């Protein structure tokens, strides 16, 4: 499947959650491979507590085959760990030019 694998993961999670999601690399690896604060940003629109919304997103994320683990942190951050298979696929899509690797 062509395109940015991280963007595809964000779109897949966003489609499952019914909202646009941006994934970022956390500065601390203990916070997962990717993280999002979408629950904190959109809680007022959904009229729900951020932590409750993040817990629902974590359930949806955990159902995706690319996600090995999803957990809520702090007031409503969502931390994601991707599967080794997804990571291998993502690394395989990196274009390295004419190098023979």
Locate the predicted segments by residue.
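N-terminal alpha-helical targeting/anchoring segments
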Residues: 1-98
């Amino acid at each position: 499947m062509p395109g940015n694998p991280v963007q595809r993961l964000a779109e897949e999670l966003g489609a499952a959650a019914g909202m646009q999601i941006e994934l970022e690399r956390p500065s601390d690896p203990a916070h997962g491979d990717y993280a999002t604060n979408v629950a904190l940003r959109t809680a007022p629109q959904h009229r729900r507590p951020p932590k409750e919304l993040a817990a629902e997103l974590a359930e949806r994320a955990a159902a995706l085959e690319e996600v090995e683990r999803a957990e809520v942190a702090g007031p409503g951050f969502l931390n994601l760990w991707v599967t080794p298979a997804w990571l291998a696929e993502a690394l395989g899509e990196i274009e390295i030019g004419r190098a023979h690797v």
